[in-house]
Curated annotation (Swiss-Prot):
Expressed in the intestine, vulva, and cells of the somatic gonad including distal tip cells, gonadal sheath cells and spermatheca. This is U6 small nuclear RNA (adenine-(43)-N(6))-methyltransferase. GO terms for cellular component: nucleus. The keyword Lipid biosynthesis does not apply. PANTHER family: RNA N6-ADENOSINE-METHYLTRANSFERASE METTL16, SAM-DEPENDENT METHYLTRANSFERASE. Residues 420-424 are annotated as: Involved in dlc-1 binding. The lineage of its organism: Eukaryota, Metazoa, Ecdysozoa, Nematoda, Chromadorea. Changing residue 423 to A: Reduces binding to dlc-1. Abolishes binding to dlc-1, and reduces nuclear accumulation of mett-10. Blocks nuclear entry, and results in cytoplasmic localization of the mutant mett-10 protein. It is found in: Nucleus. The gene is mett-10. RNA N6-methyltransferase that methylates adenosine residues at the N(6) position of a subset of RNAs and is involved in S-adenosyl-L-methionine homeostasis by regulating splicing of S-adenosylmethionine synthase transcripts (sams-3, sams-4 and sams-5). Able to N6-methylate a subset of mRNAs containing the 5'UACAGAAAC-3' nonamer sequence.
Amino acid sequence: MSQNNEMHPRNPYRNKPPDFKALAVEYPEFRKFCQYVSNGKVTFDFKKDAAVRCLTQTLLKKDFNLDVEIPPGHLVPRVPQKLNYCLLIDDLLKANKLTKNVIGIDIGTGTSCIHALIGARQFNWKFIATDGDEKSVRVAHENVAKNGLSSSICVVHVNPDVKTVLMDVVNTIPDTDYAFCMCNPPFFEKGNGDDKFCEDISSSTETYSNRVASEFRTAPHSATFASSAELFVDGGEVAFVNRIIDDSVLLRDRIKIYTTMIGRKSSLKPLQNRLQRFGDDVKIMISVLNQGKTKRWMLAWTFSKSVSLTTIDRPISFQCPKPGLTRLMQEISILNGRLRQEDTLAIVAEFKCVTWTNQRARKRAKAILSESSIKKAKWNFSNVACQVAFGAGDGKDSYTDAGNFVSSESIPTNNLNAWDNASQAYFPLPNGEVPGPIIRIRIQVFSEDSYDSISFELISGSKQHLHQLVQYLKNLICR
């Protein structure tokens, strides 16, 4: 069953999977692996290694303007999955305000160098990308160069027989601190992956494929070809990640956030238990990476006391009739919100004051102010006391310059001897201080055939304000 709806909320493939028909029209090489069926739709042959490789190259070109070479017989990365991983790291960096001069380490970058290429292109990160295979390093270096990212990504060959994974790389540049490291380790222990991968005898190099090697397995949905080094390692992924943990104990906060992708759920427990032995010195987080028919996990840990790995709140979202973005921007403008483009995926809205609550009281106050002075005097007359303390200054509202006194009204209650009295007053700020936004949110709109899906993510401010605002906008836009 597809898990696309559980992808990272900022992943554009979540609500808009690749349009094979449009890709076939635009890219002749991709068209070779497509077939038109009677209902006018296009089917794609996922069972061919060349087809899967072409799909990845096409998506990288169209959606990220990346021209990437992936040699036959090497692992073909799935773009939505890799973007999910990068977005989770981006969440952690933003939550900890680690967004300037970000330098990361990609362990086992592979021929595609996809983590570093997406990170540099999409998030403006810098990378040291390492690999123990000389061919992978050579091809990765060529991919970086032809995409004009040599100033952002340095591809380094490391000795695969050395036990340490990070120490040599980090100590090469002693005065540099790294924001994060990331890794997609080989999943299988040597000799234990034979039920899922068999050697491809048609290949001139040592290549393995996930073609059916056992009568007890069903045929895979998508072809996977890879070299031995990309699939197998002594001790499997648990042993490999333990080597990263060993280095992290020595490096401590030279790397702020250590992360790795985990391919098998059974690997999480022993790794988590190992990290928990360090007690309060370490913070741990496990996140799920959902995409297509595949589930992976991200294990993150830190020794830095200033870094928080608490679970990041998932954005709130709702669906509405088209054009959702146009109506959303109109309503935010009415609420005196300020919009700016953050990147190709999101816009940011800022509000200096809460203008979306107590709408009935606001409408009543506005109606009172628009009435004639005689009616207003009659309406306001009641035998109650009201005291309003005015601030010192020029008498202007610090947010809207509308004056520091807005309204005072008395409202009858069920008790004949009691009235509810509501007063609203604004006070100017001393010394001409300009307040910052009380809430900042990241908004992303995904377009479907008949509706738009709008996602809201809290950047700063109150969660209560976020929920109030989203509910207010939903009531207006979805009706």
